[in-house]
Structures are given as C-alpha cells and as structure tokens.
C-alpha cells in the first residue's frame, strides 16, 4: 500500500474508500482503521491485498511470536498492526508524508504493552538504508506494493538489504499488468520465489521469497 497511483474501475470499489473507518476482526481484536481517500489518496485506504495478507498471517502460516518483522509501504498499517497483535516485534514503514496518518492508526489499535514493541519509521525504498541493519528482520511484509515500474529496482535493493539468508518475504498482490510479472521475474533473479496462497474472491496472490544461497547459484 505504498504511495502510488491506483486504478479502481467500479463505483462500488471506490465507495468503500470514502468511508472514514474500515473495521476488521483479527487476532481476537476489533481493528478500526481510519481512511482518508479525499486528502491522502491511495496511502490512506485499506486495499484487498492487505486484508488477504492479514488473514494469511492469522491462519498461522508463518511463526510470528517473538520474531522481528517489517512492513514496507504500509499505508494504513493494517498488516503491521495484525502482525504485532500476533506477537511479532514490528517496524511499520512508509514514506515521510504518510507517517503521521500511519502512526494514528497504530496508536488507536495497539494496546500500550504492544506499542512498546512496535516502531513506526520512515523508509523510502533505496534511500538511507543505513538506518536499518543489514539482514535485520526475520520477516518482510508487503501488501500491494508492486505497482510502479520505476520503483522496482529500489524495492529490490531494499529487500536485499533488509533480508538475511534466513529471512522470509511475503508479498500480497493482484497480477493486473505485465509489469507485475516483470517484477516477479526480477525478484526471482535474487530470491527463491513461490506462490503460497491465492484468494479467488479478492483475486489476490501471496508470494513467499527467500534469498538464494551460493550453493543454489552454482
């Protein structure tokens, strides 16, 4: 849910974005996410990919308790909030312009004892990566962040920096255009990639990626 243009073709699809609150139930909590389509656009609404990825995390598909996780292009922060409620130590990131809105959702939905293990931090892909330790996170999460082709190289550089050989990347997305497949092809040059989930109702895929080790490349 990064700050990118987005095409929504149906009137019904747009209506849900104009609601000031989107309410969800995850991890035995009611989560109320503020939305602000009119003023902040795509970064301030909940996209289907975030819902599907949050559901996948709640299913227990990956171990979260006690693990370090980062959400990229977090937008409203739903995925990071769910990961924190499920026990992860989460860093929730987006560009500077989105941070105050993101913080408001995190503070409204996480109990104080979980907020102490959760960080909201600026991250523009490909920039100032030195503020993050190489291979810092066990789990890297992204929902609907594969979109603008001109960001692909920076996103790959960011993933490469944040991942260790043991890190797991989970990317939730719709495959709308050829450029989406192009990104997956670029990802496969540096990572082992497999599809682990598909939601037919929302037409959202989840891909898991891990760094290729040297033995695989020989």
UniProtKB/Swiss-Prot annotation:
Keywords, alphabetical: Cytoplasm, Methyltransferase, S-adenosyl-L-methionine, Transferase
Gene Ontology MF terms: ATPase binding; heat shock protein binding; Hsp70 protein binding; protein methyltransferase activity; protein-lysine N-methyltransferase activity
Catalytic activity: L-lysyl-[protein] + 3 S-adenosyl-L-methionine = N(6),N(6),N(6)-trimethyl-L-lysyl-[protein] + 3 S-adenosyl-L-homocysteine + 3 H(+)
Superkingdom of origin organism: Eukaryota
Subcellular compartments: Cytoplasm
This protein's GO CC annotations: cytosol; nucleoplasm; protein-containing complex
Positions contributing to S-adenosyl-L-methionine binding: 47, 73-75, 94, 125, 143
GO biological process, one term: protein methylation
Protein family (similarity comment): Belongs to the methyltransferase superfamily. METTL21 family.
Assembly information from the UniProt record: Interacts with heat shock protein 70 family members; at least some of these proteins are methylation substrates.
Purpose: Protein-lysine methyltransferase that selectively trimethylates residues in heat shock protein 70 (HSP70) family members. Contributes to the in vivo trimethylation of Lys residues in HSPA1 and HSPA8. In vitro methylates 'Lys-561' in HSPA1, 'Lys-564' in HSPA2, 'Lys-585' in HSPA5, 'Lys-563' in HSPA6 and 'Lys-561' in HSPA8.
Protein name: Protein N-lysine methyltransferase METTL21A
Organism: Homo sapiens (Human)
């Amino acid at each position: 849910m990064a700050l990118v243009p987005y095409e929504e073709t149906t009137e019904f699809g747009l209506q849900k974005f104009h609601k000031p609150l989107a309410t969800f139930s995850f991890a035995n909590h009611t989560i109320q996410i503020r939305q602000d389509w009119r003023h902040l656009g795509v970064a301030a609404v909940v996209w289907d990919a975030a819902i599907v990825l949050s559901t996948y995390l709640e299913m227990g598909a990956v171990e979260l308790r006690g693990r370090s996780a980062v959400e990229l292009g977090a937008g409203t922060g739903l995925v990071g909030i769910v990961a924190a409620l499920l026990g992860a130590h989460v860093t929730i990131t987006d560009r500077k312009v989105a941070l105050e809105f993101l913080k408001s959702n995190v503070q409204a939905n996480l109990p104080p004892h979980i907020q102490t293990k959760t960080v909201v931090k600026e991250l523009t892909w490909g920039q100032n990566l030195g503020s993050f330790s190489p291979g810092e996170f066990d789990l890297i999460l992204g929902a609907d962040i594969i979109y603008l082709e001109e960001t692909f190289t920076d996103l790959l550089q960011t993933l490469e920096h944040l991942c260790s050989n043991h890190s797991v990347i989970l990317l939730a997305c719709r495959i709308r255009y050829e450029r989406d497949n192009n990104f997956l092809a670029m990802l496969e040059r540096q990572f082992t990639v497999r599809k682990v989930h598909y939601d037919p109702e929302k037409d959202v895929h989840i891909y898991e990626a891990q760094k290729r080790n040297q033995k695989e490349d020989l």
